Design a protein with these regions (language model features):
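Short, surface-exposed loop or secondary-structure junction motifs
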Residues: 3-199
Length: 199
């Protein structure tokens, strides 16, 4: 670790996008492979090495910058503390108590779709075709093969039907109609307005 200020980053900093990471490379597998001169598709450890060899942009907690990388770290922390795979822990300890039984970490390709998973489309204005994330050189739809979705883990890989997502939100929103799976204090902390920017 080049910058010793990394040791000052807390779980709360990660949750609030206040870690100070210099960039967010998770949607740039091919760039990471080229930059690090890898002979394989980048794995989590490669992303860690890339980010940790740079200085932080700002001291942890002093500013905010959206960070998928921070949420990847949170996924790893959950695995380390629980001793269980991230997806298994979240399904058993969060989603099932909320009444959600059909949410999953998604796949990268159309063929990976779960039975109730939506068909994705590329937004107008985005390049529809990009190089496949694994460096094959094959051009694919951005939403099917453009990114390594399972690698994202807690940083945006979850998929679920609108009904499942509504159940989850209802179980953590602090409203009385549905019993919350977290405490009122946790709801208040989670929803506290803490920044004047965009997140």
């Amino acid at each position: 670790i080049k910058d010793k200020n990394y040791y000052k980053i807390t779980v709360e900093h990660l949750l609030r996008h206040q870690g100070g990471f210099y960039r967010d490379p998770l949607f740039s597998s091919n760039d990471v492979r080229n930059q690090m001169q890898l002979d394989h598709t980048p794995v989590k450890e490669d992303f860690y090495k890339l980010v940790l060899r740079h200085n932080l942009r700002f001291m942890p907690g002093e500013s905010q910058r959206y960070s998928n990388f921070g949420y990847l770290l949170l996924s790893e922390i959950i695995e380390k503390v629980s001793g269980r795979p991230y997806e298994e822990f979240i399904c058993e300890e969060v989603l099932k108590p909320a009444g959600c039984y059909d949410m999953h970490i998604g796949g990268s390709y159309y063929s990976d779709r779960f039975p109730n998973e939506a068909r994705y489309y590329t937004h107008e204005g985005e390049g529809k075709f990009v190089e496949e994330f694994n460096g094959s050189g094959v051009m694919v739809e951005r939403c099917y093969g453009g990114n390594n979705i399972p690698l994202l883990s807690g940083a945006g890989a979850w998929c679920g039907s609108p009904a499942e997502i509504a159940r989850l939100v209802a179980s953590i929103n602090g409203r009385p109609e549905v019993e919350d799976i977290i405490s009122a204090d946790a709801v208040a902390q989670m929803t506290e307005y803490f920044d004047k920017e965009t997140y």
